[in-house]
Each structure stands twice: as C-alpha cells, then as structure tokens.
From Swiss-Prot:
Belongs to the TRAFAC class myosin-kinesin ATPase superfamily. Kinesin family. Kinesin II subfamily. Signal peptide: none annotated. Its main location: cytoplasm. Residues 417-431 have a biased composition (Acidic residues). Residues 782-791 have a biased composition (Low complexity). SUPFAM superfamilies: P-loop containing nucleoside triphosphate hydrolases (SSF52540). Plus-end directed microtubule motor that may be used for anterograde axonal transport and could conceivably move cargos in fly neurons different than those moved by kinesin heavy chain or other plus-end directed motors. This is Kinesin-like protein Klp68D.
Length: 797
C-alpha cells in the first residue's frame, strides 16, 4: 500500500492500521442520455483525485459539491491503467500472505460488471478479475523454492440467499463465524493449475448467475457475486506456510422502480438489492463514525464483508458513477458513501502457518503414501527374484524325461508295456512336482498383481496430490521475458509515484490558504483590500458549500430519523400487542417457563427454546396438577373475547372460527312436500252468477223464522220482479204470483213453498245455460238458503 492509504489513526504495535482505499470511476455518456439531451453534472480531475458535482437545475441555490478520494478516473481511463495503478499492489500483498478485497459499488448501469469482469475475448477491455488471474500465475511461475495450492470458489447472494454458482443444485448455504473470520461451510472449491482453469471456472459461474433486463441496463445483475481465491504458499527450504485470500465482489446496483420500470419478480429483486446496499451503507456510516455497534448482521452481504470492512483485510472500494443529470441524486449518494468509507480503518495481518491450511495436509499425506509404497516395492523386488530362480530349475527336468522316452522306444516289444508303465509313473511324479511349482508361481503372481494394483492406486493418489501442488520457478522463459518483468516493475513504480503526487497535491491545496498571507507581500492598501476580498469570496464560497452540505445532512438525518421512528413505533405496537395476548391468554407458569428457556441464536438470528423437557405445573388444592386459568375469563373452557361471543351466536359462515367447540350449526332443512292445497271444483260462469246473486243478503243475514215473514216476503218480491223483468219486461208473469202472494196469509210459510213448487223451478243439480232463456211461464226462483252448503251457517244463525 502507498503511504497515502495509511492515514493518521490508531496503529497496532505489529501491523499499522490501513484505511480503505477508495477510487471513483465515471463512465461515459450513454447513447440514450445523449439523445435525450441530458447535461453532464460530473467533473473529474484525475491528477488531484477530485470529483465535482453540480446541480444544473438549482445552480443558483446550490454550490458545487467537491469530493476528494485516493484516485479518480474519468471516462477516458483504460482498464489497464486502472488495474496497474490501483489493483496490482493489492494482489501483490495477497501473494505475500495478506487478505484482500476489491468490490465495485454504485448505481445500476454505471459499469460495475464491466470494471470487474470486462469484455470477453478482448485483451484491452479485460476486467479486474481476469487480470488478477494472470498476475497470480506470473508470480507463481517466476517464484523458486515454493509450492503453491490455488483454490477458487464462486457464489452469489440472490434474494438474501446464498447460492453456489459452481454447483447450482447444491443445498442451502449459511454464513458461519469462527476465530479466523467469516466463512461459508459446504462451499464447493475447485483446484486450479493455470490461468485457463480459473477463466473456465469464472465462465461456468457467470452462466449460472442471475441477470435480467431493466430500462436502465439490458444485462442488469440481479445478485451480488463473490469470486473467492485462496492461495497457499509453502517455502520448501524453511517449510513455512502462508495463506492469502482475495475476494473479488461485483455488487448489484441500487435502483429506483420509477426509472428501471421493474415489476413482478424484478421488483422483488430490486427491493432485496436495495435492502442489502442500505445495510452496507449503514455499516460504512457506523465504521466511519466509530460507532460501538456495527450492524454486520443486517444482511448476508455485510456478514461476508465483515473482514473486509474494519477487519483483517486490505480493501479497495471502486465507486462507479454516471455523469448525467438524470442520475444526480444517485450519484450524490454514491459519492457521499464513498467519502465516508475513506475513514474506515482495517487491521491487515499476514496469515502465517494457519491451522486449516490444505497444503500442510497434502504434504503430510504425500509423505505417508511414500512410506507405504517404499516397503511394498522392496518386497515386490524380492519376490520377483525368487520367482526367477524357480523358473530356472524347471527346464532341467525336461532332458531326463526325453532319455526315459528314448530308452523305452529302444526296448523290446515284450517289455514295452512294462517300460511304458514305469515311464508313466515317473512322468506322473514329475508332473505333480511341476504342478506344485506352477501353483506357487501363480499364487505369487496373484499376490504381486494385487500389490501392483495397490501400488498403482497409491501412486495415482500420490501423483494427484503432487499435481495439485504447483512448484514455482517453471516455464518462466516460455511465459514472460525478462524485459516484460522489468516493464511491469516500472509500471508499479510509476503507479506509486502517481499516488505520491496526488497526495502531495492534496496537501498543497490544504496548506495553500494558511500560507497565502506569508507568501504574498502587500504593497499598498488597495492591494490588501483586493486580497482580502478574494479571500473573503473564497471563504464565503466554502461557507455556502458547508452550509449546503449541512442542510443536506440534516435532511438525510431527519429522513432517516423519521423512518427509524416509524419502524420503532411499529415494533413497539407489535410488542405491546404480543405482551397483551401473553398476559391475558397464557398461564403465568407457562409464560415464566418460556422466558427462562428462550435463548437467542446469533448464527441463525432468531430465538430458540431449549430441548430439555418441561417441568410439570404446580398442583392445585385438590391434589391434581394443572394450570391456573388466564385472567381473561377463569370460568370458560378457553379464553374468549366479547366479539367472539357475539359472533358465535350468529350462524353466518364467517362465525365458524368463533365457535367454542368447533361444531358447525346449520338451519333445519325441510323435506319435499308430498301434499297439495285443496281446490274447489270449477263452476260454470252462469251458475256462479246465480249463486253469487243468491248469496247477496243486502247487508243482513237470512233468518227464516216466523217473526221475520215481512222481510222475507219483500225480498221474495224483489227476486220475482227482477226475474220477471229479465224475461218479459216489467209486470209480465207477475200477476198470478202476486195474486197468490197477496191472497195468502202474511205469516204462512206453506204459501212460500206452494209458490216455488207451482213454478216448476229446476233442481240444484241441473245445469243452466246463460244463452238459453227459461221456458215460458216458468220464472226461476231462488232456492232457500238451506239448499246451498255455504249458506247453511247463515240459515242456522
């Protein structure tokens, strides 16, 4: 690190503290911004490390905002310049045994992925990650008397979940913490032996990374990607081991829904991304203000960056910004957070002889395998010597058998059979001895074959372990020439010199005002007044800038305070509600036992209960063990509110959840009707008219008694007159009836019967047609009330 990165601060007795190195890079204007005519609001001065931001909308009200960083690069800066001046020294420190971290921070669409990964297939546009691979293997190839073990891992944080990009279908990953720092167990690591292997791993991970389309970026990263490189180095002369770890982080950009047009799944991703970046901003603010509590556990991203921010690491933060006025607010926020990160101090420590170094384990395993193979090879050589001796003795018996066969052929024919039997016995004895020797040889060959297979397996395992260890100092002339190595050294020296120049320039600007009066001599009062005016104008401009900065800080502070107050009010309200439920619906013994058994798990960030069995509740007055009823209602079987009681009385579908016994009550369902209403038989219209006229009593009931003969006579006359008028006009056929009526006694009922019978009226069952007139001389008369069923009641009355 340069001297400029070691700002004043507390220093350890062993290793001085180092501040986070902050670099700002501004991308060029996009085609869309040019077509829309958006003005540029960012001015970058690389020779001083200064970035100026001007609000063109309120140029009269707001002053230019000036920010100073360790380095600043405009749109014309190349990838090679950025790497050699900023990243190259950090990677060299990692190769010496330190921990390093490089992460790109900024708004979406500002070139973070381009800075970290670059363009594939173009050497000039390669990003930081592939250039890091080349520097690592260049160092390995030209370092002698060292063994190296290089492992790489690749993961992403998507929707606050860790995913292994090298094993997409792996199980869920968690962040753990131990004495040496934060780590991710069960993360797949791949051993690499060259630059091509590391590039191949990076391509595999990039294919599995989550990207999406937004209005601000066609290939927007929807997750935070972390490429981890672990380099173990062993000095073969002193047998000391050093471990360097490098984390290359490509953060997803912060975004606003109104600008990106995110919806559905993209909107959920944006909310999680903004939440993680907000947590990162809170961590940076807490570290910059030396707060006693740093909220590392607010997100998975801050947990993984715990060592990089304020821990055992050398860190570079590359803040990417856009020059357009369209992104003014986002650019201002990024510059402020980057300015705060300058004051974060880390404590880098060289990792020497770590306990978890794989290189040490591999060396011990190689020595063990060599010790196993050596005696087996010696035993194998001894067995091969004995087998050769046995094979030499075997051919000596063959001439003996040939002589016996020759003598048997020269014998007589009489003794031929005897000689053949003897020869066969001799051949059988020799064949048995040969078979025994062959069995021993076969057995020895089998044992040797098994040992050979075992030795081959051990040798293959040994070769595999030795193959993973890369020995330095090989193929140096084939990779880089001496002139190229010297050129790289010169580039590093130039980068260091440029950093020192920027530091000196910044110090001169700070001391310029204090030395202004000493350097300038006043000749007259007018010149003194002019100098005072210029000094006053500068001071006033600084005052306005500081006042604007103070107002912005107050606005941001008030906004954060309001958000915190709202969150606190919601939490307090929820806490009171939960406590109210516990106090009124949970027995006191249960509540006390739960409070004593609850433990907070810092790894899982949640409360858990101990697994030991719960004690029995205290016994009551009757000797039975049981809980006391809650204070809500001790008589009921369960606590019930007044609203639940009212709802339980109703039979609405929504009231089922308020039933105390969980029994559904329904209305009675009536069966289908099997009977019908009685309907009177239909009567013809003419008969209905006659019956209706007969039933008209004129307001009085028909009383057929001796005391009402006068009324009965008058009514009968009215009926007869009406019938006569309808048949033959007035007075027709009325003479005989009137005479008979007049001549009869007034109260004599038999006279009425005589009148009805003398006219020959039809019976009740005879149907009358309304179109047919009754026969001449017959006047229809009304029957007595007793003849009609409906009139019987009137007659009785």
């Amino acid at each position: 690190m340069s001297a400029k990165s070691r700002r004043p601060g507390t220093a350890s007795s062993q290793t001085p503290n180092e501040c986070v190195q902050v670099v700002v890079r501004c991308r060029p204007m996009s085609n869309r911004e040019r077509s829309e005519g958006s003005p540029e609001v960012v001015n970058v001065y690389p020779n001083r490390g200064v970035v100026e931001l001007q609000n063109v909308v309120d140029a009269n009200k707001e002053q230019r905002k000036v920010f100073t960083y360790d380095a600043a690069y405009d749109a014309s800066a190349s990838q090679t310049t950025l790497y050699h001046e900023v990243v190259f020294p950090l990677v060299s420190s990692v190769l010496e045994g330190f921990n390093g971290c490089i992460f790109a921070y900024g708004q979406t669409g500002t070139g973070k992925t381009f800075t970290m990964e670059g363009v594939r297939g173009n050497d000039d546009l390669m990003g930081i990650i592939p250039r890091t691979f080349e520097q690592i293997w260049l160092h390995i190839n030209r370092t002698e008397n060292f063994q190296f073990l290089v492992d790489v891992s690749y993961l992403e944080i998507y929707m606050e979940e860790l995913r292994d990009l090298l094993k997409p279908n792996s199980k869920h990953l968690e962040v753990r913490e131990r004495g040496s720092g934060v780590y991710v167990p069960n993360l797949h690591a791949i051993n690499c032996k060259s630059v091509d292997d590391m590039i191949r791993v990076m391509k595999v991970g990039n294919k599995n990374r989550t990207v999406g389309f937004t209005n601000m970026n066609e290939h927007s990263s929807r997750s935070h990607a972390i490429f981890m490189i672990k380099i173990e180095m062993c000095d073969t002369e002193t047998n000391t081991i050093k471990v360097g770890k490098l984390n290359l982080i490509d953060l997803a950009g912060s975004e606003r829904q109104s600008k990106t047009g995110a919806s559905a799944e993209r909107l959920k991703e944006a909310s999680k991304i903004n939440l993680a970046l907000s947590s990162l901003g809170n961590v940076i603010s807490a570290l910059a203000e030396s707060s006693p509590h740093v909220p590392y556990r607010d997100s998975k991203l801050t947990r993984l960056l715990q060592d990089s921010l304020g821990g055992n690491s050398k860190t570079i933060m590359i803040a990417n910004i856009g020059p357009s006025n369209y992104n003014y607010n986002e650019t201002l926020t990024t510059l402020r957070y980057a300015s705060r990160a300058k004051s974060i101090q880390n404590q880098p420590i060289k990792n020497e002889d770590p306990q978890d170094a794989k290189l040490k384990e591999y060396q011990e395993e190689i020595e063990r395998l060599k010790r196993l193979i050596a005696p087996q090879q010696q035993q194998r050589s001894e067995k091969q010597g004995t087998i050769k001796k046995q094979r030499v003795k075997k051919p000596k018996k063959e001439p003996i058998s040939q002589e016996l066969i020759g003598s048997a052929l020269q014998a007589s024919s009489a003794d031929l059979q005897v000689d053949e039997d003897r020869d066969s016995d001799g051949d059988g004895a020799e064949s048995e001895s040969d078979k025994e020797n062959e069995a021993e040889v076969a057995k020895s060959n089998e044992e040797l074959e098994r040992e050979r297979v075992e030795n081959a397996k051990l040798a293959a395992k040994l070769a595999e372990l030795e193959g993973q260890l890369v020995r330095g100092g090989k193929n140096l002339l084939d990779t880089y020439s001496e002139r190229q190595i010297e050129l790289e050294k010169k580039l590093v020296e130039i980068a260091e010199r440029k950093k020192r120049e920027i530091e000196i320039q910044q110090q001169l600007e700070l001391q310029e005002e204090t030395t202004l009066e000493i350097r300038e001599r006043n000749v007259s009062l007018e010149q003194e007044v002019e100098l005072k005016k210029r000094k006053l104008s500068k001071c006033y401009a600084k005052y306005l800038a500081l006042q604007q900065e103070l107002n912005d800080c107050k606005h941001d502070h008030n906004q954060d305070l309001r958000e915190l107050e709202m969150a606190q009010n919601e939490l307090v309200k929820e806490l009171k509600r939960q406590l109210l439920i516990i106090d009124n619906f949970v027995p006191i013994e249960v509540k006390q036992r739960l409070y004593t058994q609850a433990k907070y798990d810092e790894e899982q960030e949640e409360w858990k209960f101990s697994s030991f069995p719960l004690p029995l509740p205290p016994s009551g007055g009757d000797g039975r063990q049981g809980y006391r009823r809650p204070v809500s209602h001790p008589q009921r079987r369960r606590p019930t509110s007044e609203h639940a009681l009212q709802e339980a009385k109703s039979n609405a579908p929504s009231s089922l959840r308020f039933k105390s016994e969980n029994i559904v009550s329904y209305e009675l369902e009536m069966p289908c009707r099997t009977t019908q209403e009685y309907r009177t038989p239909k009567v013809s219209a003419s008969l209905q008219a006659v019956l209706a006229q007969a039933m008209q009593t004129g307001g009085d009931d028909i009383d057929i008694v001796d005391s009402h003969t006068n009324s009965l006579r008058s009514r009968l006359e009215n009926i007869i007159n009406a019938n006569s008028s309808s048949n033959g006009g007035p007075g027709s056929g009325a003479g005989p009836l009137a005479a008979n009526t007049a001549g009869s006694g007034v109260g004599s009922m038999p006279n009425v019967r005589n009148i009805k019978s003398s006219r020959g009226l039809p019976s009740a069952g005879t149907a009358l047609d309304s179109n047919r007139r009754p026969p001449t001389g017959r006047i229809p008369a009304k029957k007595p009330a007793s003849a009609y069923p409906k009139a019987r009641g009137l007659v009785n009355k």
